[in-house]
């Protein structure tokens, strides 16, 4: 009957320590720091060192009993005559300008001429287009055939807009009022 007090928690034939002793060895982080979840190491493997969380200073843990303490990596001095300055990698930045051709409309625009490759502001002129002819035909249909049908030819807001280069005088674009393009 004296064997009733034997600890039945045996691992590899060796009695294990009671759970109360394991709880006393557990250390808590100082106040103000979140508690990191720690897992018990598996048998046969040394405990792993996890990197500290960003934003918090690294914590020093006392060495655990029964495991050899790891040595920090050995640092070697620089060879004699070698520069002692740290190596700074430089990154070359290539800037590529992308020029987006502006949308041609009713007003002059700043652009690069596709013919003479100069940067300039376009010269605009008004030309009779499909909108002028449509309004003229509609006026004739409604009975304004005695000269009133010619009024749309004098209204610039109904005419197409032609954009020309101010240097080489070549036509760059024609804005069509009917299609809006």
UniProtKB/Swiss-Prot annotation:
One of its GO biological process terms is: response to bacterium
Task: Extract the GO molecular function terms from the UniProt entry.
Answer: zinc ion binding
Positions of the UniProt region annotated as Membrane-binding amphipathic helix: 131-151
Q: Which UniProt keywords apply?
A: Endosome, Lysosome, Membrane, Metal-binding, Zinc
Q: Which residues form the LITAF domain?
A: 90-177
Pfam family for this entry, one: zf-LITAF-like
> What is one GO cellular-component annotation here?
late endosome membrane
The entry marks the following residues as binding Zn(2+), namely: 113, 116, 165, 168
InterPro entries found in the cross-reference section = LITAF (IPR006629), LITAF_fam (IPR037519)
State where the protein is found.
Late endosome membrane; Lysosome membrane
Positions with biased composition (Low complexity): 13-69
What topology does the record note for this protein and the membrane? Peripheral membrane protein
Disordered: annotated span: 1-82
**Which comment does the entry carry about domains?**
The LITAF domain is stabilized by a bound zinc ion. The LITAF domain contains an amphipathic helix that mediates interaction with lipid membranes.
- Family in the record: Belongs to the CDIP1/LITAF family.
Protein name as annotated:
Cell death-inducing p53-target protein 1 homolog
Name the gene behind this protein.
litaf
């Amino acid at each position: 009957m004296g064997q009733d007090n034997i600890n039945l928690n045996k691992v590899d034939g060796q009695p294990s320590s009671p759970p109360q002793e394991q709880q006393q060895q557990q250390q808590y982080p100082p106040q103000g720091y979140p508690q990191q979840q720690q897992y018990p190491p598996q048998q046969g493997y040394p405990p792993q060192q996890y990197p500290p969380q960003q934003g918090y200073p690294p914590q020093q843990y006392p060495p655990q009993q029964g495991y050899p303490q790891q040595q920090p990596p050995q640092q070697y001095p620089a060879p004699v005559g070698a520069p002692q300055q740290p190596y700074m990698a430089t990154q070359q930045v290539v800037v590529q300008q992308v020029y987006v051709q502006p949308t041609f409309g009713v007003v002059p625009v700043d652009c690069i001429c596709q013919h003479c490759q100069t940067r300039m502001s376009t010269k605009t002129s008004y030309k009779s287009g499909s909108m002028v002819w449509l309004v003229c035909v509609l006026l004739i249909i409604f009975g304004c055939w005695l000269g009133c049908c010619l009024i749309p030819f004098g209204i610039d807001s109904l005419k197409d807009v032609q954009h020309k280069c101010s240097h080489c005088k070549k036509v760059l674009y024609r804005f069509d009022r009917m299609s809006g393009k």
